[in-house]
């Protein structure tokens, strides 16, 4: 049944510039009716009071065990100072190992060391040295690769260059193929070589067909190696971990959680490097606890638990965890705390539209945020809605106050504009959901890609990141280039696949899975399969765009790809934001609770 509306609302929507068919692989359908570029809706307030409450559909979500966990924690500042002193003393020794010698073999060794630094969580200590090594080595690739027949070495060199945005041809792996055109079976017993090739294969683009073959080849054989018991136990565990989360798609801060214990059990590990990694990681853990004491105190003072109905996700610590995907180094507490506050604004906005607000309330909130001030109808709305609106507006006022002295007011203004856009997307989906409407898949994705908050999240990251965002950075984001469009689509589909059962359990049918099932007449499992194919293709496009995008600063491209890594961790077979009790809880425990031993 179609929803009926009364007074009118007009909201702006930006048309996507990257055609959907280029990602989805099937032709766009022509639809008649109202254009999505300029929706005019009529609203009515016929339902009031108890009648309004009786039709709400929402699941009460459990209170998080983390919200008050860190209030009583005490961090010893003198311990942190001692760790910094030890790190400062060891850093020159490690730097000397990286940069001391010259020549092709030495360049090759330095590039191999980059993989170790990233894996141990130490890359941020040596960014200049890493960039210099790769810049100098890029012109020597052919010489380095000439006659190199070690699979592990070739794979890691390939991985290092592509990881940092340098294009190197995947043809370097043709030397490992036999006369039959397949990868040589003799490679299958070389566990570390196979593991390195597996990691490298995840950096493939749409044209790297050999890497698609490599991924298939290594995946099956690594599973066998890990299961058969021929590998050392610590290597088998490591293989199982990377099969679940390849390093390329992992949050950078989570990689050393698993790799440091693995490296410690390697017979040829470097004691200085291992000690440096442990000291660095422990300092990070202490800094995170300090941050969490601040953000959870801020969150407690908002009093959401007593002021709002229990429809929202009580996820302040989860918000902070996801911030670490893009800002994890110890000196950036200020930026992490601000971004956590921003993520909280996005989360309460999404929950209000998605899980609780009636249509008249959704219209009033959308109009108020479009005006960036309460509209006339807001006075007639429930108190909870006024609290949500006031929280968002006041939080941005604080951002403005903090950043204006630094000459960064434009970042707040640009972020507000993206916040308005995601509000529009939330409203559009809420309108469909209230009407129990399942649109065409393409129509849904056009709206859903904005609603999923990728662009608004990136705007907040730009606002908070250390390398001050420029107006050009925001213009790039606003133009919705292929990089951004693809990331939006990937996030939308992963969210809808992993959250499908939750959506259906609360009567929320406006979902990519339902849209695809309806349009193409397929089953749920068939829809999952087809949508996952789109996601696999999207991963290749993201790699391609990271390597080929020009005129955009590397820090902006890296932040964008780090967001892709956050999305991978959030939806890796589960919906990790709404239900962080499983794997996400394990990750948070490893970072915030289980202190690394020295």
Swiss-Prot record:
The keyword Lyase applies. The gene is TPS26. This is Terpenoid synthase 26. Its cofactor is Mg(2+); Mn(2+). It comes from Arabidopsis thaliana. InterPro entries: Isoprenoid_synthase_dom_sf, Terpene_cyclase-like_1_C, Terpene_cyclase_plant_C1, Terpene_synth_N, Terpene_synth_N_sf, Terpene_synthase-like, Terpene_synthase_metal-bd, Terpenoid_cyclase/PrenylTrfase. GO terms for biological process: diterpenoid biosynthetic process; terpenoid biosynthetic process. Pathway: Secondary metabolite biosynthesis; terpenoid biosynthesis. Binds 3 Mg(2+) or Mn(2+) ions per subunit. Keywords: Cytoplasm, Lyase, Magnesium, Manganese, Metal-binding. SUPFAM superfamilies: Terpenoid cyclases/Protein prenyltransferases, Terpenoid synthases. Involved in terpene biosynthesis in roots. Possesses sesquiterpene (C15) synthase activity and diterpene (C20) synthase activity in vitro. A motif (DDXXD motif) lies at residues 350-354. One of its GO terms (molecular function) is magnesium ion binding. It is found in: Cytoplasm. Its main location: cytoplasm. CDD domains: Terpene_cyclase_plant_C1. Pfam families: Terpene_synth (PF01397), Terpene_synth_C (PF03936). The Asp-Asp-Xaa-Xaa-Asp/Glu (DDXXD/E) motif is important for the catalytic activity, presumably through binding to Mg(2+). Mg(2+) 3 binds at residues 495, 503. Mg(2+) 1 binds at residues 350, 354. Predominantly expressed in roots but also in stems, leaves and flowers.
């Amino acid at each position: 049944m179609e929803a009926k509306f009364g007074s009118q609302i007009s909201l702006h929507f930006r048309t996507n510039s990257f055609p959907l068919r280029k990602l989805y692989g099937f032709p766009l359908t022509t639809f008649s009716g109202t254009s999505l570029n300029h929706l005019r809706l009529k609203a009515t307030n016929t339902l009031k009071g108890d009648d309004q409450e009786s039709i709400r559909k929402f699941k009460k979500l459990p209170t998080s065990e983390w919200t008050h966990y860190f209030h009583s924690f005490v961090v010893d500042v003198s311990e942190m100072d001692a760790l910094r002193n030890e790190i400062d003393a060891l850093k020159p020794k490690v730097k000397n190992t990286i940069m001391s010698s010259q020549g092709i073999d030495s360049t090759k060794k330095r590039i191999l060391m980059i993989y170790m630094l990233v894996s141990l969580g130490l890359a941020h200590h040596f960014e200049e040295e890493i960039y210099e090594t790769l810049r100098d080595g890029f012109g020597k690739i052919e010489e380095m690769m000439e006659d190199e027949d070690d699979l592990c070495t070739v794979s890691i060199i390939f991985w290092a260059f592509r990881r940092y945005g340098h294009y190197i041809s995947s043809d370097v792996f043709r030397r490992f193929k036999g006369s039959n055109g397949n990868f040589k079976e003799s490679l299958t017993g070389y566990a570390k070589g196979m593991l390195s090739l597996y990691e490298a294969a995840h950096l493939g683009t749409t044209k790297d067909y050999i890497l698609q073959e490599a991924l298939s080849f290594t995946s099956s054989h690594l599973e066998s190696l890990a299961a058969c018991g021929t590998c050392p136990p610590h290597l088998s565990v490591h293989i199982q971990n990377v099969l679940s989360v390849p390093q390329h798609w992992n949050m950078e801060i989570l990689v050393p959680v698993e790799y440091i214990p693995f490296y410690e059990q390697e017979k040829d590990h470097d004691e200085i490097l291992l000690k440096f990694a442990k000291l660095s990681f422990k300092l990070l853990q202490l800094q995170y606890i300090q941050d969490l004491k601040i953000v959870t105190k801020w969150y407690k003072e908002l009093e959401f638990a007593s002021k709002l109905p229990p429809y929202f996700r009580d996820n302040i610590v989860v918000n902070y965890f996801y911030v670490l995907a893009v800002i994890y180094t110890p000196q950036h507490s200020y930026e992490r705390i601000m971004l956590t506050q921003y993520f909280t604004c996005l989360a309460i906005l999404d929950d209000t539209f998605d899980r609780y607000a009636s249509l008249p309330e959704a219209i009033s909130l959308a109009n108020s945020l479009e005006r960036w001030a309460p509209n006339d109808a807001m006075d007639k709305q429930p108190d909870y809605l006024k609290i949500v609106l006031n929280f968002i507006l006041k939080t941005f006022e604080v951002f403005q106050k903090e950043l204006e002295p630094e000459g960064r007011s434009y970042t707040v203004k640009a972020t507000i504009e993206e916040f308005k856009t995601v509000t529009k997307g939330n409203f559009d989906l809420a309108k469909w959901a209230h009407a129990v409407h399942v649109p065409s898949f393409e129509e849904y994705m056009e709206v859903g890609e904005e609603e999923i908050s990728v662009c608004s999240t990136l705007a907040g990251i730009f606002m908070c990141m250390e390398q001050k965002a420029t107006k050009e950075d925001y213009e790039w984001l606003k133009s919705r280039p292929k990089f951004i469009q693809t990331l939006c689509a990937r996030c939308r589909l992963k969210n809808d696949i992993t959250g499908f059962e939750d959506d259906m359990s609360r009567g929320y049918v406006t979902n990519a899975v339902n849209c695809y099932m309806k349009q193409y007449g397929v089953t749920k499992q068939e829809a999952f399969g087809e949508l996952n194919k789109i996601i696999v293709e999207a991963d290749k496009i993201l790699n391609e765009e990271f390597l080929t995008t020009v005129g955009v600063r590397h820090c902006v491209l890296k932040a964008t790809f780090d967001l892709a890594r956050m999305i991978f961790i959030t939806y890796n077979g589960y919906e990790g934001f709404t239900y962080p009790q499983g794997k996400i809880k394990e990750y948070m425990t490893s970072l915030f609770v289980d202190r690394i031993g020295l």
